[in-house]
């Protein structure tokens, strides 16, 4: 199917698709695996979560790393299970499309969520969890699938990720309205859900997807210009040889 589409596409589109195919075959999603194992390791090591969690007072005292590492800490095994499984699956999908896009989405969403909590939730002392970053990865991957399906005029294929995005928006709406989570029993775990982190994560996923698509388009245009220049040079040399 991919080969058939590539043959019908323009040279620049074929080049862009070929680059993505090469990246997809580059190997296992190592960064995703490493971060997932790191989150599990932090949970298993006694005292690590307390040292790395988002703790407002400690950050104010200069422990700035907590703003990033806090996303790798969790409240209980159930919380870790849901977050880590979603991160592993979504991260692997995004990383196989582009490792740079995966790392950028994780880094920007982690920083943006912590900054938002710092400025908009000054009364929040503690925060843990990968769910905000999971939200960013989900929106990136679902949006990418929609974009690719529409680019190839496969409207039916675009339906499922579109429905998934709508369901995700409904989930966030439910969390905002009820203050409860759908998948993790936050009350039993002794922590309060924070839908704001999911909203910020989703926004970051959309922004990083847009940046990735623009960069991909710019790269395709540049490759097309190089091809045109080579063709012109070949034509010029052919005329010179004929003379």
How should these model regions be labeled?
Residues 150-165:
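Membrane-helix boundary/juxtamembrane motif in polytopic membrane proteins
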Residues 19-33:
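N-terminal membrane topogenic signal
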Residues 29-46, 87-141, 161-173:
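Small-polar-interrupted transmembrane alpha-helices in polytopic inner-membrane proteins
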Residues 80-87, 128-139, 189-209:
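Alpha-helical transmembrane segments that form the membrane-embedded catalytic/substrate-binding core
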Residues 1-23, 170-243:
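C-terminal transmembrane module of polytopic alpha-helical membrane proteins
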Residues 56-60, 76-91, 109-113:
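Hydrophobic, membrane-facing alpha-helical anchors
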Residues 49-76, 175-185:
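Extracytosolic (periplasmic/ER-lumenal) interhelical loops and adjacent juxtamembrane/interface segments
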Residues 45, 92-97, 141-151, 207-216:
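Structural signal for the C-terminal ends of transmembrane alpha-helices
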